Amino acid sequence: MKFVDEAVIRVEAGDGGSGCVSFRREKYVPDGGPDGGDGGDGGSVYLQADESYNTLIDFQFERFHRAERGKNGRGRDCTGHGGEDLILTVPVGTRAIDEETQESLGDLTKHGQRMLVAKGGFHGLGNTRFKSSTNRAPRQKTLGTPGEVRSLKLELMLLADVGLLGMPNAGKSTFIRSVSRAKPKVADYPFTTLVPNLGVVNPRHGQSFVIADIPGLIEGAADGAGLGVQFLKHLERCRVLLHILDIDPIDGSDPVESARAIVAELEKHSPKLASKPRWLVINKTDLMLEDELKERVENIVKELEWEGDVYTISAYNREGTEALSLKLIDFIEALPPEEEIDKEAEVEFKWDNYHENANESLNENFEDDFDDDDDFDDDDYDVKVIYQR
């Protein structure tokens, strides 16, 4: 299935059902009083994370989603049925952003996690609600309020512990094949990897971590060159980054300059991403003799002024990959528990406080004094609809 990590959709919550104006009609009860019921609340729209999904492609073909409207109230104090909520299933790691305000509604990072993105309209009130000692035959009702409408931008960011960085043909896909059962395409030309790949590494029994491979970066990637820049966001949630460096590039380029270009692109794209723990992994060591290899590695580390961890591997021959995997699992296990993603400012929905405000308004204007046998005159009042802003 095609990998799609962005989609724009429109969600519409259901309108609230309107209240009803009705009076009790029953034999031997000449003055039955009001019995109009309230309407039902409109259905809301939710996003729910499911780990069995890994793409947003479904939302490219179906962009409009609407929840059910609440039913109107009826006589005999019958309350309208509430509209059914609409639940949209998305992959774990999805972020929802309001297109108009650009505010983040939240991230779904756990299987089964649910998030409200459009709140259903509030139900209208029937004329029973307006009965008081001074208004025994109320002909007022309120209409249901409209449901919220939002344009949402959905962004999928893969959840992985380790992310791979490097120039095209540095050997990232070969490395992920050597340490996991993932089978990304490998070939001798640049940009063989076109979409991110995930692999699960099991260095020890009962211990594992997830590794992510993205398309290679080139100079100018932060400004739109190449493919990798659009996938850099998938590394934002990684705990550690592996900078894969080809020790002997086939095109004759300088590995040191390539490494510097990658670091520069990271800093341009996201200083937060550039500040993550980053290990230098020098690949394709099988192409050099041992003496020449040692000298070349020392020169690279010296020129880069690299102060972090440095590892030499041959992903093709699986030399050094197992030891590196063990180092990674030990490092990840030693890290403190991952902090929850920073919560954005609390999102306000249209009708969050409507219920409380409506009740306060009723209490101010009417006394709560009910009598089922209050007298009323059918011709005293006309039906009055109260519109709520």
UniProtKB/Swiss-Prot annotation:
Please list the cofactors this protein needs: Mg(2+)
Domain Obg residue range list: 1-159
- Disulphides: none
Report the InterPro entries cross-referenced here.
G_OBG (IPR031167), GTP-bd (IPR006073), GTP-bd_Obg/CgtA (IPR014100), GTP1-OBG_CS (IPR006074), GTP1_OBG_dom (IPR006169), GTP1_OBG_dom_sf (IPR036726), OBG_GTPase (IPR045086), P-loop_NTPase (IPR027417)
**Enzyme Commission (EC) number:** 3.6.5.-
Q: Which GO terms describe its cellular component?
A: cytoplasm
Q: Which residues bind Mg(2+)?
A: 173, 193
Protein location: Cytoplasm
Q: Which family does it belong to?
A: Belongs to the TRAFAC class OBG-HflX-like GTPase superfamily. OBG GTPase family.
Q: Provide the function of this protein.
A: An essential GTPase which binds GTP, GDP and possibly (p)ppGpp with moderate affinity, with high nucleotide exchange rates and a fairly low GTP hydrolysis rate. Plays a role in control of the cell cycle, stress response, ribosome biogenesis and in those bacteria that undergo differentiation, in morphogenesis control.
Protein name per its UniProtKB record: GTPase Obg
